[in-house]
Each structure stands twice: as structure tokens, then as C-alpha cells.
């Protein structure tokens, strides 16, 4: 912890405690209960129809989905590495540690889901192993992974800056790929893939909101928010318009770039900054499914995955980041 971080309550060893009650940070605790109510397992996702649908896709579509899944499978492990090695040890507030502990379990489920999807769709073992090792074998995936790992290994940047960086990993690096899978849903294809995408995108939206909430609690905010966000945006735009262009599945690359800018603007506002891109959402099918600022799109347990009675409590919200734009 740097000298400037010594006064941060979130990082202050004096805040460390082993008994939960009484709750001290009610907004952080409420976010944990929201995550807890959204627990799911891979056994709830049926892939039976996906196997038939996979054969209906053309070679470009299969290539695109395979590479997106390869990125996702690697990225959840990277997020967990950061939680284990950095955030969960740096943050001393117990309510936040509860959230991080639960997030690690959820990221494990995501990783299991993506690995299972690859294992189900890809029959050739060499291709399967190539995809499982994507951060070494696929340059475009490696570039995104390297960006995230750089922040884990960074010993000079303060907690606030690294918090923003991982909000970008979960809020921006995932956004375009999530949208591309929802695009397939419009065609009525791959119901297992698209359902798991709904579950995972909601989880990641909540994780991104949590990062914004912790940043809100910091006395010393990150002074490089726009720089970090814009850097992530450029990497993501390159990934989905050049390295793995979405036109492989019939999407418009320019519209995808605008969508990434739209998501970035919302993240910036949730971090207390002005918009940079002033982008509108070009995808009507993503209106109610956005990673940042809207996590209330789950109304059915084919999407209805909130556990009964979990998270019901009295009290007012002290922090809101669900503003509609």
C-alpha cells in the first residue's frame, strides 16, 4: 500500500475484522447479497440442441465462436488471478471480501462453462487444445490477456487505477463478444450458448458495478480513468473489427465499434467521468442487456435466476448506478 493509500478505509488494516455483524458497509453488503442471489451452475445449461445447431453454422461462424470462447475461457482465470493475488488481499473491508470470495466462485463457474462449450463443440483434439491454450496460441487473445496481466503485475499503479483497469476487463473486453453471441440468439441458434451468455453477462455486469462502487468509496480516485478506459476501447475495437471481425457472423464492424464506445461511455459515467465518445447504442437487441449500469434484465429462470428471498432486506440504497441513458 502506497503512502497515499494509507488513509483509504477500504485498504486500512484497522478495518480488518473476522465477524460480519454488525454490517458497516451496507451498500457493499447489498451488492454481495445481489451476487449471492444470482448463483447458478453449468448443470442448469442444456447443450443438446447446440450440437445440431453447430453443424448448421458455416466455417466462418464456427471460427468466430471458437475464438470468442477461447478468449472467455482464458480471461476468467486471469480475473481470478487478480482477485487472489491482489484485490482480495489489499481490500480489508469484510463486506468487500465477501463479494470477492463469491466472485471467485462465480468466475470458476464461468471458466467451467466456457471449457465445456469448447469441449462440446470442437471434436478435433488438436484444435481443442489449441483453443484451450489461446493466450499462447492466438495473438489477438494474447494481446488482451497481456493487457490484463500487466495490471496484475504492476507494482507502481495504485489500487484505484488497477480497479478501473479490471472494470475495463470485465466491462469493455467482454462487451463486444457478449453482443456478438446475443446476435446469434436473434437467429434462434445455439440456445445453450446464448442462455449461458445471458447468465455470464449479468454476472460480469454486476462485477463491473462492484468495481464502480468500490471506486466511489475511495477518497483518492483514479486520475487516469479516461486514459485507461480509452486504451481498453482501442484494444477491443481492434479485436472485433480486425483480429476477429464480427462480419464473420454477419454483424457490422463499424456498429460494433460504436457499441463498444457506448459501453465505455456508460462505464466512464459510473466512475464519475464525462462521456468521451457520446455514442448511442446501435444494437436494439442489447437495449436491456448492457454490462454497465443495467443489471435488471433477468425476469425469467430460463432467465429467472435470482434465488428466492436472498437479498431481501430493509434500508435505502446509498449508491445507485442503474441510471437509464
UniProtKB/Swiss-Prot annotation:
Keyword Oxidoreductase: yes
Any single Pfam family the record assigns to this protein: Ribonuc_red_sm
GO molecular function terms noted in the UniProt entry: metal ion binding; ribonucleoside-diphosphate reductase activity, thioredoxin disulfide as acceptor
Keywords: Deoxyribonucleotide synthesis, Iron, Metal-binding, Oxidoreductase
PROSITE patterns tied to this protein: RIBORED_SMALL
UniProt cross-references to Gene3D superfamilies, sorted A to Z: Ribonucleotide Reductase, subunit A
rRNA processing as UniProt keyword: no
InterPro entries tied to this protein: Ferritin-like_SF, RNR-like, RNR_small, RNR_small_AS, RNR_small_fam
E.C. number: 1.17.4.1
Cofactor note: Binds 2 iron ions per subunit.
Sites where the protein binds Fe cation 1: 76, 107, 110
Cofactor(s) listed in the protein's UniProt record: Fe cation
Catalysed reactions, semicolon-separated: a 2'-deoxyribonucleoside 5'-diphosphate + [thioredoxin]-disulfide + H2O = a ribonucleoside 5'-diphosphate + [thioredoxin]-dithiol
GO BP: deoxyribonucleotide biosynthetic process
Active site, renumbered: 114
Residues involved in Fe cation 2 binding: 107, 170, 204, 207
Task of the protein: Provides the precursors necessary for DNA synthesis. Catalyzes the biosynthesis of deoxyribonucleotides from the corresponding ribonucleotides.
PANTHER family referenced in this protein's UniProt entry, alphabetically: RIBONUCLEOSIDE-DIPHOSPHATE REDUCTASE SMALL CHAIN, RIBONUCLEOSIDE-DIPHOSPHATE REDUCTASE SUBUNIT M2
Family designation: Belongs to the ribonucleoside diphosphate reductase small chain family.
Assembly: Heterodimer of a large and a small subunit.
Designated name of the protein: Ribonucleoside-diphosphate reductase small chain
Species of provenance: Encephalitozoon cuniculi (strain GB-M1) (Microsporidian parasite)
Classification of source organism: Eukaryota, Fungi, Fungi incertae sedis, Microsporidia, Unikaryonidae
